């Protein structure tokens, strides 16, 4: 096939062998075993056992090498021929001043070489043109038909190839006095393995790569359409070939150069009357060229016509020998000869431009011998790491995928495509033939400097170690002393993708073995030795151009050829992929090649076995014909092995004897011929001491050893006896024989070999007589062992006779071991298998038939007699059944002592086992307190299935099976009751337990069911007890009962009721928590509702707050100082709550005294020794921005706590004069340590109490809430009495009058607002006694910034308040100490309450009016409010922008989907809530029917009934949806109303 025309088809796979560990121990023996199969393929692959994994011993850090450079398309033979052809034709045109540009046809570069070959095969240019077969040429070049490509090919052929072909044919070499080069093949120097490189041919000094690359750059070629459209192109198409065809691919280098050389006139001009040399050109083409008009363009100048005849006669055409028509006479720039343009072949239509050379000069230039092809070394030195990085990067970039993901099939097809392509130049590098002796072997080596581990020592001595295999005893190379690199010393190979090794056979046609240490696979191709000559013939036939210049091309490892091409010509080829850890073996004269799939590391070496010797001799004769150097002397190797025959392996000795015999016969014949020639002189020569180059035949380059012919007069050379006529021309009397051994010494050596070879026959005869007992005498065991030892010591081959001897010895040893066991009683042990009676008789017969005399046969006969006697006794005992169990057991023990298995002993064993099993069944089923388990019963049943059947055994087995089935069924039912999701009522469990009481088996699930039923009954009793008690059950008790009930696998009706009660109680507590607790509060609900137990300890309160900041929440379970049991008594709870109130009041008074004694943070300086306040943040509050708690009198940072807001009144009032009523401003500050909850209003708490009354559960929080409510109402009553006293009422009237004075001159637009605002104020009346104190405020009110000038918004309000601060004066009331003290005490007690009451606010305003305004606090609050206002504005802007973006992004469809989802969720939520509501109503109705109140001793009914009327007196103008409790709590300070 043509390379590259078809897709690559992989050849069949070579044989693959996987030896066992036993076979793997003998490498060369195993190779000899598989040789008949593997040799037919040429190569084979061996996979070692999986555990054989030698360590990689190369020192990676010190490993440096320089690889070879391989250009892939120069490796393939046919591609190289094409490239050489392109070089030659390019050189042809370059000499004539034109550069070659290869045209493109159908978007592919035109294959000029194939076109030339096909034209020649089709009969030549003239014949194809005559028959118009250019379309056939296009078809053979695989171009599609119907596109007129044939005419285009003809144009290219005429323009580029035809002039070169005419030149090559010699048609235009008329009268050219040129002498052809000597074609005699010179001796090609072959470097033996001691030379570093196998590829001895050096690369060309001048790389043709750049020239080829330039040629392959496509230029636009004229198509057929262009030729038809442009007449000038059509005219140029029929021109003859030549360098004048510029623009069609052949361009002159110097367009403007004019060549005109003048030749001196010779003294004599001889005109020869000869015929023109152009007669062999077709007349049609010649006429066509002669009929063309000369070109009118600027061309080379012709010689001018001179009037002198001398000048006319001096210009003579070298072809026609005429000087006429000198205007068409062309002058050569190389030799100064003259030619008519029409005398040239082919003729030229005009004088060409630029430099022109005649055919003689072109011939001289083109006939220079080509330079030999070889590999060049890379310029960069690599380490293993750097080379691997380069290789992996190249492969991944080339295939555009990770290296490990590239299929091997893809790499293989791409490789053969690249080597066959003249268009793509891919260059790779290959670290080949790296000396392991210099760089280190990949296998561990024993003589290395490093200390080897035991594992490494094992691999260092293994026969498969490539450093060991060539020097094994069975190997021939172990008898060569020199370390031949590559043959005895391994070579290393570091490959990358596409790096290749070309077709070759090993030196001396030896074996080779290659091991891939690691890396990606290596692809191999192999050809068997029988087809080696056929492969050489095919390659020479397909590429004769290469072999004409290099006959030994295949020995240089530089040439590839596509396996498909070889297979198409009948060469059998196989392939394989060698993976890491695998061996590949090549057999003698088996051609092989291949390439690497990627980055890998391999090691290879040669070895020679006994069967190689004939092939080695044939190889020497082949080398002699090719005149190739030998690596070693084959004769020397044979003689060296023959000199020490006892050290040879027997197979090797036999093979050496045969080779030695043939060599001696040939030596006698050659010496006889030398004697007949007349050479009589001779002298002994120790050839092995001479260097190889001093004992090589000057004719055939063979290394001489046995003999050589030399000459006294020509001492510089010698010849082998096969070329005695090629030494010199001297007389035979001057020639003499140089010999190593005489003809008498050679037969002696041959005889010693024969003895060694025939020693095996002598030994084999002895073994045959012993094994077949031919003399009638059996040999002893020691005699047979001596024969086997002799074979091992003398290293006889592993023959069939030796195997028979080994088998016989093995049988004898086995018989002796069995006999010793019988006699000594060793087999009586239970772990030793016993012989049967039949086997004992067979053993006796075997011992008698073996060819070995054994005295143990008498012992075997005695044992056989004892066994037969025992057998008779056992039969008698079995015949008299039922016998006593003791007798049977004693007979059984005696039989076991014999060491032989008797059939009757088996029956005795069965009887004993049956009796034992029946006893165990009776004991298990006997009524007793301890019942057997199911496992025991199942074990008995399994044992009963194994023993032999009998009526009693069958009956017991049936009863046991029935009992087990019943027990398992009830166990399954009990398991279902325990594990089922739907729990069963106690009645069902009691029924199951009653049914299983009569089963005599311990049932674990039934027992678990009993325990569960007992627990359920106890749980029901606890529920009844707690439900029937004096009080409602506590929530903790119910939760504990629910948790226990849920874990019980019993269906309990009371559990659902308890779960609902617990759920309702949790719901109430959650609602109460939301009402009281702040977000992320550090207090529990119970702590908030109870009096503060640590009110007097400032450190305790602050530690509580720090625990909240750190997330350390703790629950105080003894807030009231009561145990869990005491909390169940409502009376104890009330008493403890009262005591807690008193402790809280005492504690806060102590804390106020302590904090009041601390220096104020607003003071200019603080004493270091005095105690200071600590804020909740842990720092000391100081400077501006600190606030003092009105309850505990401690100081805090304003930014660390929640502060009151001054702007709490409606906005219209802020722009009017009543703003000066500073005592009504919300400046009261309670720290987070004092204000622990949200402090809901009293009406909210009363709603929680109403819900609590419906709960049939007691909660500690409910008790605490009831106490808190009673405490709050009690305080409210005392506060109302205090506010209703005459003195306080008078003070309240003064404040009311003062407010009226401040509201006297409102703005017109604010009048309506003030009217509504003052109507709702509870402080409406006052006294005129202190009107003068606020007169200044009224007068200065006109100077206040007018509302019109204030910007709207909260910022303007804060500015207004700030502007009013200088105008605030006070106090506005005079509070006597008798009034102030009770009010302050009431204020303190009200602040302790976690409830919001209006009376608290009224008392606060009264106390504020009776003292000067706290300007520092007001300024601090204003600054904090401004800071908060700025942050809120920034957040509001960002929020507004985010909302706008969301509105733009949201679509109508999304809104619909959201609405649908919300509706579905509401529907589900309403369904769930309605279900819960119905359940709550059900249980509430039940509770109402049973008159279940909160507690008998503490009833909410009187308290709630007392406020029932106030709930009904709701303001008729109120728009609230729920009943209001404000009429109950609100105070009226008018004269018409009473408190």
UniProtKB/Swiss-Prot annotation:
Biased composition annotated in UniProt, kind: Polar residues: 197-210, 1494-1521
UniProt-listed InterPro entries: ARID_dom, ARID_dom_sf, JmjC_dom, JmjN, KDM5_C-hel, Lys_sp_deMease-like_dom, Zinc_finger_PHD-type_CS, Znf_C5HC2
Compositional bias (Basic residues): 1432-1446
Residue ranges occupied by any JmjC domain in the UniProt entry: 458-624
Domain ARID: 79-169
Position of the signal peptide: none
Cross-link (Glycyl lysine isopeptide (Lys-Gly) (interchain with G-Cter in SUMO2)): 205, 229, 244, 272
Zinc fingers classed as C5HC2: ranges: 697-749
Places the protein is found: Nucleus
Segments for region (Disordered): 192-228, 1429-1521
Alphabetically ordered keywords of this record: Chromatin regulator, Dioxygenase, Iron, Isopeptide bond, Metal-binding, Nucleus, Oxidoreductase, Phosphoprotein, Repeat, Transcription, Transcription regulation, Ubl conjugation, Zinc, Zinc-finger
Biased composition (Basic and acidic residues): 1477-1491
Enzyme category, top tier: oxidoreductase
GO molecular function annotations of the record: DNA binding; histone demethylase activity; histone H3K4 demethylase activity; histone H3K4me/H3K4me2/H3K4me3 demethylase activity; nuclear androgen receptor binding; zinc ion binding
Superkingdom as given in the UniProt entry: Eukaryota
Similarity section: Belongs to the JARID1 histone demethylase family.
The protein's assembly and partners: Interacts with PCGF6, MSH5, ZMYND8, AR.
Misc. comment: Involved in sensitivity to docetaxel.
Domains: entry comment: The JmjC domain is required for enzymatic activity.
Name the record gives this protein: Lysine-specific demethylase 5D
Organism annotation: Homo sapiens
